[in-house]
Amino acid sequence: NPEKLRPMSDKFSISPTEVHRLEGQKLSLQPDFVAVEEPLEIQLLVGDSTAAQPISVTMRTPGNDESLALGFLFTEGIIKHGNDVQSIHVAEDPSGNALTVQLKSHVTVDLAKLERHFYTTSSCGVCGKASLEAVQQQCNIELPKTQWKVPSQVLYSLPDSLRNQQANFAQTGGIHGCALFDLDGNFILSAEDVGRHNALDKLIGHCISSMPTIPLSNHILMLSGRISFELVQKAAMAGIRFIAAVGAPSSLAIDLAEDMGITLVGFLRGERCNIYTHPHRVNP
């Protein structure tokens, strides 16, 4: 049904950027591409109602948003098949990041139950700019100015150090990890979980309960996978100023790191990496 799956053609799934590429001790400015990350709000029109009810906000890469909405509604048990949907269209929102799904008259939905079940984070607006501003308002930690630099050889040592701490990953190959290091690359603590966001929450929670220094402004956070907006958000709340990861960051993760004064390093493998924001904290 073309009415149901009309493409959102003005959205792009990748975005051009420039990175400082560090190979060995050589630093160069290179063009690159990153995956776009933006919020998508899913709204429902049920029965005779003329007011759409927001039920979920999810961070996603634009593209096939209508399919994402249908899949979400089906896997959450809100619809049983495609025929339950009358239409899907882009909501009247200037960001273009909201979809309204109109259900057919025979479909009954307990909207009050949905509101309780789906937690929509207050820091997640329906445009990237709103999300960034919300995090800036939440992060009221006073951060000291940093004078330090991380030597490239310290940076290159971090992936192996993290891997050595991941006992569960070594056995299963299916778990995310993160670790905190001091500026000399000495291991402090790590956490693991099947969810990368949970792993970081565990690590920060341990710091809150056992370490005297929050914010963690003089530490390095090392991640085992990709860097999403939410991971940078959590790190920013803890005052972390340096994030390194084996994987790539999303576009919104880069934007947030830039705004919050966080050095963001991705594709850290062997003796090479990409520095996406605030490269002054890396000493080649």
Language model segments and positions:
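Short, Lys/Arg-enriched N-terminal segments with co-localized hydrophobic residues
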Residues: 1-7
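Short beta->alpha transition motifs characteristic of CBS
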Residues: 192-194
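Feature captures the catalytic cores and cofactor-binding loops of soluble hydro-lyases/lyases
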Residues: 115, 196-284
